[in-house]
Every structure is written in C-alpha cells, then in structure tokens.
C-alpha cells in the first residue's frame, strides 16, 4: 500500500497499545479544498486531526501514526465505549460536505479506502461491525460521511454490515414501532436516546441510521422500511 506522509502535531503524546485499536471511524473533511483540509488538520489551534486522509485522486496521506491517539471523533459513544478517539483509527475523505456542496466520493478515493481498511483490519484484527461513520458515534453533532458514502459496497468487503434486500420480518415483531426501533439500534451500538421515552434527540439519531442504511429516505421518521432494516441488522 503506497502512502504519503504529512504529519500533524495534533495528537495525544502517550503511545497506545496495538490491542486498544478496535474501530475505524470514517469522516469527510467538509471543507472547500484539500489544502484547506490539510492545513486545518495540522493547525495546533484547531485541535483536530486524523490518522489518514484520502484525497479525490485516491492518494493516502498519513497524518498521525497509528499508535498515537488522533483527535477526530470528539464526544462520542458506541456500545460500552465513550470517547472513541482512544480506541480508533480516524480516516478523513476529502469532500466539500453538506455545507459547501456535498460530492459523490470518487471511485479512486473509495478504492484506496478499501485497500487501507484491508490493511488496518488485518493488522489490528478489527471486527466487521466496527467500521463506523462519524455520525454513527456522534449523531447529535455530525452527519458525515453522509448519505452518498457507499456503505453497501464497503460491506461487500466485510467493512460494516448491510441488509438483504428481500428479507422478511414477522409482523408481530414490528408492533410498538418506536420502542422496537430504538431497542434494535441500542443492540447495534447506537446511543444518545431513551428506548422507552421520546426525546428531542430521536430525529437526529433516526436520520443518522437512515443516512447509512436508507440513504434515499433520510426523513427522521421511523417508516416501515427503516424499522425492518433495523430489525434485520439487530438479529443478524
């Protein structure tokens, strides 16, 4: 795997053990250019960084060594874990994001991401379900990598799970829609909601799930399709 090196000083100085790396978190840069993104990831005042950046041409740039904690996840939760920075590798894909003109990720970019993920998965024994998006672990704050990110394609390489297009679910299991849906999400690893009581976080969490698994249907509402997908993923 070919990669360039352009190191940032934005990382926690203490070296972490290889066994502590359990997740890969995928982001988009959300800035107007590659140069602007790199400058921000290297600026000490920004207090943000990533381990790898992949540009539109598919070049992989290492910005923080794997054994250091980069500052990419921020306030985050997934299953029993909080502050996913400590346990993850952060990958930024150059993309203008929703603020500046959200783009389809380039073929070269995704091909390089797959190569990088294969290497990381093998090196750190990362489980298939532990390839996540920033919005999965921080749904109240973040929406990246967004609905144009090809999670279905990545799942075919065993990076993240997907659902079968023709699956059936027992109707009885779909009664009490909201509670069933959030129980399913809790089992998957999502947090920031109350299974038994509606709150103001619900819509953002639903949208986060839809951006990943139902990208043409990001409504923030629990419709039949969204509910069925959540159930399939929770039981498989």
Per-segment meaning from a language model:
Residues 1-129:
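Active-site-adjacent loop/helix surface patches within enzyme catalytic domains
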Residues 70-73, 138, 234:
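A sequence-composition feature that detects small, non-aromatic residues
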Residues 1-5, 228, 232-236:
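N-terminal secretory targeting signals
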Residues 97, 102-193, 204, 208-218, ...:
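Basic/polar, cationic surfaces and motifs that engage anionic cell-wall
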